[in-house]
């Protein structure tokens, strides 16, 4: 492509470079490809990556990459995704990730990933004994934790070993996922976490490490990725949430349920 012939460009990574590995990862559900394969599912999902001698050369090469998109049906809210006629966002079988702790994944026809319930105590008795019952619905938007230090990683892949220097809060989980992704024994993956700075959960689990490693593998030399703040905002966020909560209490302030 035109990007590959730009000054300073060492490698351009696209989906065709991932055909020899299983490119999906995810700490709970393996639903994130290293780069988009057949579909782009959200704003900010990587479709390609460029390694160059300088950041400005890499950015210039990225502008030369042409992508033809076919517009598909969109579910841009929880309500739209749960509708009977909603487009299926993730097809195929759900696969648990390295930190999956939700029990067995159910067969599903729609966009619901998992249903979970827990009961403790006598809820009906608590409601009958309560002097006040408050039943409300709450909406929480997606948030970005906004640490001053953005996401960054240096990756080296020589074919036999992966070496990472990454701002990650879960290095052992990242190591396990990287070993699976690139089909290496776990002892062949080494991760060093320098001074992390702020994280607040936003640097939890695997984020940029697969992309940097795949690019380093193709470039056959170490690769560094340092996000800008706006790039970090689409790298990781806490999901938005709709929540219904019913609280039961006595007139003396004792919480019953």
Regions found by a protein language model. Name each.
Residues 22-23, 58-61, 142-144, 173-175, ...:
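Short helix/loop capping segments that flank catalytic or ligand/cofactor-binding pockets
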Residues 11-16, 42, 134-138, 164-166, ...:
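General beta-strand structural signal in soluble alpha/beta enzymes
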Residues 28-58, 200-249:
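Glycine-rich and small/hydrophobic secondary-structure elements
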Residues 1-108, 125, 133-136:
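Flexible, low-hydrophobicity surface segments
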Residues 38, 152-157, 178, 242-251, ...:
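Short beta-strand elements
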Residues 17-19, 47, 55-57, 94-95, ...:
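Short, glycine-/Ser/Thr-/acidic-enriched flexible segments
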Residues 1-15, 49-69, 152-219:
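Alpha-helical support elements that line or immediately flank enzyme active sites
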Residues 121-182, 241:
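Conserved beta-alpha junction segments in alpha/beta enzyme cores
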């Amino acid at each position: 492509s035109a990007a590959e012939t730009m000054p300073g460009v060492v490698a351009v990574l696209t989906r065709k470079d991932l055909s020899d590995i299983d490119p999906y990862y995810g700490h709970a559900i393996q639903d994130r490809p290293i780069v988009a394969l057949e579909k782009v599912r959200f704003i900010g999902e990587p479709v390609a990556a460029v390694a160059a001698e300088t950041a400005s050369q890499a950015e210039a090469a990225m502008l030369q990459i042409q992508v033809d998109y076919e517009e598909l049906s969109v579910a841009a809210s929880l309500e739209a995704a749960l509708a009977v006629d909603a487009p299926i966002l993730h097809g195929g079988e759900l696969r648990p990730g390295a930190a999956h702790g939700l029990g067995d994944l159910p067969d599903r026809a729609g966009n619901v990933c998992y249903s979970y319930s827990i009961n403790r105590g006598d809820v009906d008795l608590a409601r009958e004994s309560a002097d006040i019952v408050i039943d409300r619905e709450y909406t929480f938007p997606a948030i970005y934790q906004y640490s001053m230090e953005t996401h960054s990683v240096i990756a080296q892949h020589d074919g036999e070993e992966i070496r990472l220097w990454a701002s990650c809060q879960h290095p052992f989980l990242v190591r396990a996922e990287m070993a699976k992704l690139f089909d290496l024994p776990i002892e062949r993956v080494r991760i060093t976490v320098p001074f992390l700075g702020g994280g607040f959960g936003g640097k939890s689990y695997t984020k940029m490490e697969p992309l940097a490693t795949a690019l380093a593998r193709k470039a056959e030399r170490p690769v560094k990725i340092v996000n800008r703040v706006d790039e970090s905002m689409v790298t990781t966020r806490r999901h938005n949430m709709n929540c219904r909560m019913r609280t039961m209490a006595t007139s003396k302030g004792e919480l019953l349920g």
